[in-house]
Design a protein with these regions (language model features):
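Intrinsically disordered, low-complexity extracellular "stalk/linker" tracts enriched in Gly/Pro/Ser/Thr
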Residues: 21, 105-116
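Active-site loop segments of alpha/beta catalytic cores
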Residues: 1-58, 64, 139-370
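Aromatic- and acidic-residue-enriched carbohydrate-binding clefts of CAZyme catalytic domains
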Residues: 112-131, 230-237, 309
Length: 370
């Protein structure tokens, strides 16, 4: 169970840069009792701002800056005073977060990337054969063309914005192993555990090495990041026992390399995996779906910054009364917490998003001092 001492010193919070997949950033201890964090899918900005998220968006820093300015203007027009994406924080534009989406680590291993005008890019690896999996090795990132290209972009970002802020989407050990190996990674856990663990080791080592190298470069620009987060989006494809026996060790290994650490669990029920997550020392962040046992999560993770991921589908299709009931449930049984509103599509009316954010304010005022 997480410690309650100095919780503000190791907590992370949910963060969605404009048009980027969600990630985490450092919490400052002043977060609202129910802090909404909305984020729009690329399709939203493609329709409303004409942004093209194809290859150029991911390789051309100046084009990305132009897009950021257009997206910021549209968000301010539609949602004045909301500070969505942190655009009114007074900080330099974040032109790193969202770069290459979830394809970052697979591309370091040589995967090709498929780009879309209105979606995040996707890695397109050929699944590793048994022979390829057995000889897989972590890439030398100091001589890796793809990763060095990212660092080169960071140089340009610093020149045009005066800062080197932002994050890459490192995903998680099982997520990336699944993308590299395909469905066979799950049968490997039964038929050839040595092979599965070899792949896990390679992925974990690459995540640690790459994160540290990125931090080193950012530190030169005065940005001192000391945390890592992982994404366990596909962990529900294995049993809780398999996670504890075969994957938890790698999450703990990554956790041990950084001052702060968080786990993105995805918007499904976290209940079967909570006990394992509770063994992670000083866990700074954990998210889950609203149908999880929120009371138990608050009890197990009292000092962790918690986050309920409220889906775009629910936001679009539930009645006002249902959403109000959901948010009061969050306030009563789970908060203080973030309320993630990610992946907003064009079918969600602006008024519905404002309603959700207003509910966070209403219930923060009502429950926050209790």
């Amino acid at each position: 169970m997480g410690s309650e001492d100095n919780q503000e010193n190791y907590q992370l919070r949910y963060y969605i840069a404009l048009s980027a997949p969600p990630t985490r950033t450092v919490a400052d201890g002043r977060e609202a009792f129910m802090r909404p964090e909305p984020g729009f899918n690329p399709s939203w900005f493609h329709k409303h701002c004409g942004v093209d998220f194809s290859r150029r968006w991911h390789t051309d820093v100046k084009y990305r800056l132009q897009c950021h300015e257009a997206m910021s203007k549209e968000v301010r027009r539609r949602f004045p005073g909301s500070n969505i994406g942190g655009i009114d924080d007074g900080a330099a534009p974040d032109l790193l977060t969202g770069l290459y989406g979830i394809a970052v680590v697979p591309a370091m291993f040589g995967s090709s990337i498929q780009y879309f005008c209105d979606k995040w890019p996707q890695p397109q690896p050929e699944p590793l054969t048994d022979e390829q999996a057995d000889v897989l090795s972590p890439p030398n990132l100091r001589d890796n063309e793809f990763f060095q290209g990212i660092l080169g972009q960071l140089d340009q970002i610093e020149k045009v914005t005066g800062a080197a802020r932002g994050y890459l989407n490192w995903q998680g050990v099982l997520n990336t192993a699944f993308r590299l190996r395909g469905d066979k990674i799950f049968t490997d856990l039964f038929d050839n555990r040595q092979r599965a663990h070899h792949i896990f080791e390679c992925v974990a080592a690459t995540m640690i090495d790459g994160t540290k190298l990125l931090h080193d470069r950012q530190r030169q620009a005065g940005v001192d990041e000391k945390f890592a987060t992982i994404s366990n989006c596909v962990v529900n494809m294995i049993s809780p026992e398999q996670y504890s026996d075969h994957l938890l060790r790698y999450d703990l290994k990554i956790r041990g390399e950084f001052d702060k650490f968080g786990i993105h669990n995805c918007a499904w029920v976290v209940d079967p995996y909570m006990d394992a997550y509770a063994t992670v020392p000083r866990l700074g962040y954990l998210d889950m779906g609203i149908t999880s046992d929120l009371k138990r999560a608050r009890k197990l993770f009292p000092a962790t910054r918690r986050n309920v991921l409220y889906t775009s589908i629910d936001l679009a299709n539930k009645s006002d009364e249902q959403i109000r009931n959901d948010f009061e449930h969050i306030a009563a049984d789970f908060a203080p917490c973030d309320v993630g509103l990610p992946d907003i599509e064009i079918d969600v009316p602006d008024s519905r998003l404002m309603f959700a954010m207003d509910l966070c304010k209403e219930f923060s005022d009502r429950y926050g001092d209790n």
